[in-house]
Amino acid sequence: MRELWVRWGRGYLRLMLLGAVYGVVEEGLIIKSWFDPHWKDLGMLGTYGRVWGVNTVWAAWLTIFHSLLSVSLPVLVVEALYPSYKNKPLLEGRGLAVAAGSFTLSGLVMFIFLNPYRPPLVQYTLTIVLVGFLLAVARYLRKPSPKTSKGQTQHPFLYGLAVAFLLFFVYTAFPHSSLPPVVTILLGVLMALYFYSQLGLLDDSSRFLLVLGFLSFWMIPYDILLELKGVTGEAAVGITAFLLLLLRWRSVVQKSPLEGAPVNRES
């Protein structure tokens, strides 16, 4: 997805769409958790918001989750920590072919063996159409113009942390309330859109802190929760990864101080 993003003209809306494509492909087409009412991770979301054979709230949540955590934020972290690779494709023809082939092969294996559930044909076909539509929109999206307004320049780390917590809270707590599923879906989507909108309004340093704040929720409190639930070593891995990101970022800033540097904003 990162290679397509660079080749198609960057922009954070485009990155969001490509991340969403990945989420739809993984959860909808490969794992089929969009449709399986008994998928192991669903919990309440196997019934809350299940419409026409689709776990709609789960589908929205996992699309947002993968768009951010599986695609967009890793891409932005790499660009921040290794600025010399920014705007440069990392794979050429053979590398792209190997990556695409590996993803397709692993996807087929998981489709067949990970979850034997057979999704409804019409809904599954429409999900394939959705993937094509999102790819087309991402491909032909107009190149964004530079932004002049400012984003969350004060305490971007805390802002990112707050958005991550609120997204998690909305999609884990609200299904236990009397709120209609459509409200839960829309709240999460609006928060994700607002988060993406901030990325293009910040300088490089503030953008990284915003991203790190979002990631910190999953690396520290969430991983500690997983540790308490029996996932041995998860807390140590999360905290260590967070500290390593901080150390690497400090090294980058020391080599190329960003204080007073020109603001690099995109949308």
Regions found by a protein language model. Name each.
Residues 30, 39-62, 134-167, 171, ...:
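Membrane-anchoring/interfacial helices and their immediately flanking loops
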Residues 62, 116-126, 173-184:
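Interfacial loop-to-helix transition and helix-capping segments at the boundaries
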Residues 1, 62-79, 126-143, 185-195, ...:
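Hydrophobic cores of alpha-helical transmembrane segments in multi-pass inner/ER membrane proteins
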